[in-house]
From Swiss-Prot:
Organism, as annotated: Mus musculus
UniProt catalytic activity: 3-hydroxy-2-methylpropanoyl-CoA + H2O = 3-hydroxy-2-methylpropanoate + CoA + H(+)
GO biological process: valine catabolic process
Alphabetized UniProt keyword annotations: Acetylation, Branched-chain amino acid catabolism, Hydrolase, Mitochondrion, Phosphoprotein, Transit peptide
Residues that, per the record, bind substrate: 120, 145, 168, 176
Encoding gene per record: Hibch
Subcellular locations according to the entry: Mitochondrion
Name listed for the protein in its UniProt record: 3-hydroxyisobutyryl-CoA hydrolase, mitochondrial
Transit peptide: 1-32
Amino acid sequence: MGQPYAWRLLSRVSSFRRASVILQHLRMSMHTEAAEVLLERRGCGGVITLNRPKFLNALSLNMIRQIYPQLKTWEQDPDTFLIIIKGAGGKAFCAGGDIKALSEAKKARQNLTQDLFREEYILNNAIASCQKPYVALIDGITMGGGVGLSVHGQFRVATERSLFAMPETGIGLFPDVGGGYFLPRLQGKLGYFLALTGYRLKGRDVHRAGIATHFVDSEKLRVLEEELLALKSPSAEDVAGVLESYHAKSKMDQDKSIIFEEHMDKINSCFSANTVEQIIENLRQDGSPFAIEQMKVINKMSPTSLKITLRQLMEGSSKTLQEVLIMEYRITQACMEGHDFHEGVRAVLIDKDQTPKWKPANLKDVTDEDLNSYFKSLGSSDLKF
């Protein structure tokens, strides 16, 4: 029985039964695939370690298919009181999904482009609804799929090495994994700025932005993890108390934030427009070095992706997470059929010439009809939870 067949069974069973089916299937192949993710039961909790350090712990479909059923099992286990997720290697929590594999699979007419997004979004929703305290240690690079594994959880711990970004508009995609839900809910217009520019937040700014709930010095993560796992039948309040104590004692990266101290007024003003064209005009009229730099960055992005992203966030601001994930699944499938994603992957990841030829090449040529096609229902193929 291959994995695609196993997953097709899942639409007809409950979430608990879904977990059981996957676990049974994985036992037949775990010896060849388990190295990508480590699943350990320690002390009072379960620990998930993303274990592809050479690839900055990039998220694969195989990893999703191991994490999801174990998460559901631990959630329903009366002896498991919390879940910790972290990345191996010290450089990254998770730098995103395997984008190159997606492009190659689509060209080969394989089902990966449906399976990965569908199963990843189901996992994102499971993290958001998890009934046990979920602690993501977002130490190092955290982008794309790594954001989906962390930001929807109850607790997110940043360090001085954290680097957060949603750079998808630069490869012909959009900030998915629930970006349409959490980005417009950040302070002011910060989420719109991050989504359209791919701007990188670092260190304490990841906490200041609200992406992380706590900040802890990276050298303290190991003892923090051990202290959490040594708790006796902890509640969410107990977990929060430990995290707060480490947060209060953190000393690293205490310099004032340039982005929050100096530029938030500009971000709120320039990114409050309802069209990408007006946002660019606002930046031009502002004329400050910061505004001009952001205008230049936006002008390099896929025009189609920019318009998709702005609409995604505007619509997502009033939707539930599940509604957003359904919307985003529709957009991903349209992007896989389009030009810009494959061109972005070519320019950034394959040929690495960094000069993608977007089609259309200008914002004015992305019509409302074009844009609407990315948001239309997929009927029976829509994402289901």
